[in-house]
Amino acid sequence: ADEAHRGQYGFDEKIVIKENEQGEKEAHTVIGNARIIHDALPNATYIGFTGTPISAKDRNTREVFGDYIDIYDMTQAVEDGATRPVYYESRVIKLHLDQNTLALIDATYDALEQQSDAATIEKSKKMLGQMESVLGADSTIQSLCEDIVNHYEKYRANLLTGKAMIVAYSRPIAMKIYRKLLELRPTWNEKIGVVMTGGNNDPEDWKEIIGTKSHKEELARKFKDNDDPMKIAIVVDMWLTGFDMPSLATMYVYKPMHGYNLMQAIARVNRVFKDKEGGLIVDYVGIASALKAAMKEYTKRDQSRYGDMDIAKVAYPKFQEKLQVCKDLLHGFDFSGFIGGSPLM
């Protein structure tokens, strides 16, 4: 099975209540795919290939396929030059979120990890609804977009091809981000695009922006074209898996994610591209703890190397190393005027 997390799991038998066309409730028995396949082929050998193993209730990679035969971890991939390292920068403080909001975000992460029974799922739905209100507040969206614009223009716009992705919490919030960015930068009309699924009940102005399937395909073509003026894609779920774009180097995260979903998302920025030293994850919702937890699903070697996601501790020593190279090149020259002199006219 390729991509071993997709549809291969489930040893349990569950009873699910659904409504028929007449509005009557009916009970249906649902049996997990893993049990069906194992019962049908009891003597078969099961081998799975995945970059994101799962360890959750009724969804456990090793429970279905057995222990690991071989591991090609992120550390090895970076050492081999197959991928680039991913760096992390927290900018949660820029949104001026209060302690109650931060506590709600933490509770949401817990709910995402524990969706196992009806009561927990119902509780998590309530939390997710609260998150929609908090993260979608006009003042928060204003702070978010102002900081993204400032960060992008200062540090990322002129890096490589300037391609970046904004991961929004929901479809309504994605639209708010899109409109606020255009309000702040009216000339960005060709620079940004929204990529998400549409619905029959969407407002007409949404439909014009979301477009048809062919429109999304055109956006993908434009975004992958390094010379195209489209530089920033606003997404919710689409393009977070299976979208390969080597020049993409920046991801702004405004959506709580955890586990394999988080690992797959950040992998969008670790592809190899000319002169690309690494990808950057800019965090606005406090994913650091979730990222560390996700790392526990990987090898001890990766945990020791990537366990501390503080970019200052990881990248600053490299900056000092490069700075020393510059100092060595200028050895014997008096460059004090460059540091303390007036700007060149």
How would you name each of these model-derived features?
Residues 9-101:
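Post-DEXD/H (motif II) to motif III coupling segment of the RecA-like Helicase ATP-binding lobe
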Residues 125-235:
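Conserved C-terminal RecA-like helicase domain
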Residues 3:
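Walker B catalytic acidic pair
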